[in-house]
From Swiss-Prot:
It comes from Mus musculus (Mouse). This is Centrosome and spindle pole associated protein 1. Phosphorylated. Phosphorylation increases in colcemide-treated cells. Its main location: cytoplasm. GO terms for biological process: positive regulation of cell division; positive regulation of cytokinesis. May play a role in cell-cycle-dependent microtubule organization.
Amino acid sequence: MADSLDEFIEEQKAKLAKDKAELESDPPYMEMKGKASEKLSENSKILISMAKENIPPSSQQQPKGPLGIEYGLSLPLGEDYEQKKHKLKEELRQDYRRYLTQGITQAKRKKNFLSTGETDPSTLGVSLPIDERLSAKERLKLERNREYNQFLRGKAESTEKVRQVEKNIEPKSQRNKNPISQGKSDLPLQIQTAYTHSEGPWLSRQEEGLYRQLDGEIELRSRRPLKQTKEEVGISGAEHPSLSGSAGVPERRARRANGERVLDRQHCRADRDPGVSEDMDERFRFESDFDRRLLRVYTNGRPHGSRRGYVDGDDVPEEPNTQISAAENKSVHCNGPPRSADLDITSPFAGMLFGGEDRELTKRRKEKYRQELLEQIAEQQKKKRREKDLAFGITTSGVQDPEKSPDRLKQFSLTPRHFEEMPPERPRVAFQTPPPPFSAPSSPSVPPVHSAPSHNEDLHSGLGSTLGELAHPRVLPVPLNPPPPPLLAPPASNYRTPYDDAYYFYGARNTLDPNIVYYGSGMIGGQPAPHVSAPVTHQVAPPAVNTVGQNEQKVLSDGLRNSGLVFEDKPKPSTQSLQSYQEALQEQIREREARRKKERLEKEEYEAKLEAEMRIYNPWGKGGGGAPLRDAKGNLITDLNRMHRQNIDAYHNPDARTYEDKRAVVSIDQNLATSNAENLEDSANKNSGPLQTQSSPFARGNTFGEPLSELQIKQQELYKNFLRFQIEEKRQREEAEREKLRVAEEKEEKRLAEQRARIQQEYEEEQERRREKEEEQRLKNEELIRLAEERRKEAERKKKEEEEKHNLQLQHYYERENIIGDETKHLRQPSPVVPALQNKIASKLQRPPSVDTIISSFIHESSMSRAQSPPVPARKNQLRAEEEKKNVIMELSEMRKQLRSEERRLQGRLLHLDSDDEIPMRKRERNPMDIFDMARHRVQAPVRRPSPKGLDATTFQNIHDFNELRERDSDTRVDLRLMYPDPPRDHHTLEIQQQALLREQQKRLNRIKMRRDAGADLDTICTDNAQGRRMPRDDTNDFLKNSLLESDSAFIGAYGETYPVIEDNAFPPPSQLPSARERRRNKLKGLDFDSSRLHTPQDGLSLKSISSVNVDQVRMRNEDRMRRLTEQQKKPTNTDDEGSLVDPDDIMRHLSDDGRNSAATEPWLRPGTSESLKRFMAEHLNEEQHKGPGKPGTFTWQGLSAAHA
């Protein structure tokens, strides 16, 4: 960062020198108009040159007085415009003060940042401060306005101070009053006035530029120790003895000029590096080639030569090999002026230095210069950025460079603007007058012949090398000794114009005109025109001249006389003073010639170095914005993270940032300060001899290997200390980062440990809950197993009780049979039966009869018995005994089936006790046969048993009750189990099996009613058949009337036929029965009453109806059936007497709301009906046992079950 700041300040220093040169060459007032003269085309320039021939040029020889004083081109203004001019100056002064007030505030802030090492907040994040971007025109306007305002202010202040001092020193100047008055009396009044007014612009501007430079140099010189001798400090008085005794010059002004002279000599002894002086601080010594070469464009028009007013006789043309810089020109002008006697013709006052500088005034000027320097810093950065954006090339190869276009400088205000016009010219007469004779005795001699080549050499060096290098290629060196143009007579004194001297001074010439040498001498203050337009570039300050001993009053008087400030009461300068100037000038020329020989060699080395640098020149400049990023060695930078860290470090430590300027052709040599340090020592010992030379201004680096200066060593130590500080800071930062990472890792480990502990705890709690759940499930399973075991034991106990009860009943039955058998022994034997009937009876004894067989045998026997005569009572008893034997065998067979069925049911319940399904699902192959055909053929049909999980509680309970009902042993239930071996699993299968059971029971009821209505002669057979089918043997008609099975609803047969309600009058009385022939015919036709069919839809259509699968309707029906059956069970029924058996029709009417109930609503179809009847018959059986085991006509459990079936 220190190197960056050094180079930045050095660039600003060079910029300041360039601005002062521009101020001297181009008037700010005209720059506000647009510098039209510099931007005109070639044709316009030619027209201007032709028009200027008619103007009385100041370059022509003007009439001289007896003292040889020349008068410039400037014409006097009219008396009428003096007030207006002063008013304009006052307004400009006020504007400048307002502008300066604002600039000082900003400059102080910037100075504070520079002095304290802080960074301007507006420039954070960038290498150099970047202010607002203004166009070139706006920047030039602002700059010219500021410079011109300063010029006017300085001019007014200088004039006022001179007048004040004049009053104080008027007695001392009386001795020189007469010669001056005599010299001036020979001149016309208007010339005297013009001469007086012509001093203002350039003299005031000279003083303003010098004290600005003085401020900056004194400020920089105060920062480091310098070896300054008395000889250097008092060089002004030694070199200008003729002015020491001059009268009418302000004392303060003399001290200021003296201080400026001291600084100028020190500055001119620098290493001739453009913009770099010996008194400059080390940080200002690094300047890019951009600034160095760009300054040359604006330094050719400086009027230093005209102000210093001398011509070197030893200044031989060097062709374009010599490169000129603005700072060198400044140093030449500062040191070279009073050396020869020919200065009386050119400008005797040029180069004069006055007495010592007031310290207080120096401090104020230093502060002012610092403020102006800060203002120039931002402007310089803008220009450099613009140069970079426009790819402005480095001007090192001259006019023959094929890579550079001739008009590349036009974009920097060197081309004419369409909205700007040529400046108006000063009014002049239309004819020329001959110059006045040079016959004055006090006129100085004509300069020697060698002085002209010296001037032409300087002019050629300024135009040929600098202008030819940067401006148009057609600008060539001018002749060495051009003939002077004709002189113009001064205009009439009464011709007044509204323009002031500065306007005509800057508006009457083109500073870039290649023919500027033909302007002649005497442009301003009697100086030759070439020195006004092209500065003398290679003059250097000579060593102190000790031979001059005149007093300061005399030197001041000569300076005022030669500069154009002619006072009528001032004495003329002495000849000795002029001679001293000529001798000093000759000494300076000899010293410069020796120095130039050395500079040629250094220049050749420098050009070789530049050629090498051009080969590696990077046109992109600084990396970024599309250009690759490179480090100081030219390597590509691809680590953007490292660059980011570097930028952060530079932000926090801006002073320690290493400067890397990639915008220059090559990287800057950091050893350049060594050469400057050596030059500083040379400047301290400058007075050792005239042949002592300075280091080359083109040396870029430690060319001769000089050791480092104390300041450089101190800077290196500071840099090393800062590097150590950075290393330590980085180490501490890394340590803090590691500590931070360690703390973060500890926190993370702690968090993970807590998380692991929490997860472990949750896992253990989950395991504990799982174990508790498993234990609870195990206990529940044990409880279920225990309950199942209890149920199994209870079922076994009940089964044993039932078996015991059944055995007891059998025992009672056998005892009763034995009793009956014993009784029948005493009866007579019946008559032999028909063999056919005997065979049929025997066949019946062989196997248990089926339902159809029993019915058919019943009808056949009924018809057979009708043909016989009614038997006697003894015969009835015998037939009853035979029938009872048959019934015993059938009962035993049915009991065996019941036991097997109960055993299978219990085993199934035990196996599937813990499962969800009451009975396991058995997958069977799908039988293509119709389910009703299978039922008719007694073929077992596969039934899909859905899981009871999807059933509601009511349907599940109904299925359970129906399963208990279908497991009872009866003919209808046996046939149902044959047709549907699997119990129902849903409401659909439940409905189907209920319909099948209804059909079987309906057929059974039909048979019972047929036997009831058969007649009196069939009572015995009907009774025997009823007992064979487990029906009550006594009073069948009364039992059927009181039976719970009788209903008013229609019943569906096995084949889908429906039977109407059986009314009491459905069967005719015995007297109205058909004859035996009709009954035999009906028997042969198979038109049995139970098989009679009506033309009704099939069972499939009825079972597949919507009503058959209505779950809610089935549930409501089953609930209604269970409720009615419960009410019926609460009413005791006695089967012994006929009064206890009520009419079945009355029972059905009592159980139903009306006679319109369907078969599905009958109480006998309810799932609990069979169990209820079972309990009812058990109670009745107990009553029989109490009455007596042998009483005939009692009901048995099987008989009632068969009757219910």
